[in-house]
Amino acid sequence: MRAIEAVVFDIGGVVQESPLDAIARYERDHGLPPNTINRAVVAAGEAGAWARLERGELTVESFLAPFEADCRVHGVEVNGARLMAYIADAGRSRPRMLAAIQRIRERGLRVAALTNNWVAEGRRPTDGLRAHFDVFVESAVVGLRKPDPRIYELVCRELGVAPSRVAFLDDIGRNLKAARELGMATIKVEDPDQALRELSALLGFDLID
């Protein structure tokens, strides 16, 4: 078994509740078929408003109109401000994940956050979490977003650890695929407790009491 020297956590959907759940609630509340918004975001691609928001090229305020236009092109009417309010309301931290992060650091391993995020009125939705991590890499700050391989290389450089010695937790398959291709061990977070059990097995010590 390889020796893991650092663990990298996604934020939304891993350390915090998933923004995808908030988007699904918005769709239910507004009579949209499931996954409609995500399909529009994916179809808009790297030139779309969502990708530009996560690279820090737009703030939330300047993102709303082009995002609504992207959705409209794909036949979806979305109130961008209301959707972002749903996402903001869902940004609650998962206490078990924070406790696991503390335990990992107490064992002498380095811990990083690697998040696709954005800036809203000068604030970032992750501002309250930074003290829990040795390294905090944000897409809106570095101008790269997952699954661009360069952002994984960046977090490994910041940690001072080779990718082959890093474990990465994320809730989105394409983000994990890019990390695996660089040699990282990956864990998909669908059930947080199960993910922590898998990470415990990888590290060789318990993260859940």
Spans of features found by a protein language model:
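Structured helix-beta-strand junction loops
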Residues: 107-108, 132
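Asp-based, Mg2+/Mn2+-dependent phosphohydrolase catalytic module
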Residues: 1-5, 9, 102, 114, ...
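N-terminal helical cap/lid subdomain that shapes the substrate entry/recognition surface
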Residues: 2-99, 106-107, 118
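Structured, non-catalytic alpha/beta "coupling" segments that mediate domain-domain communication
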Residues: 110-112
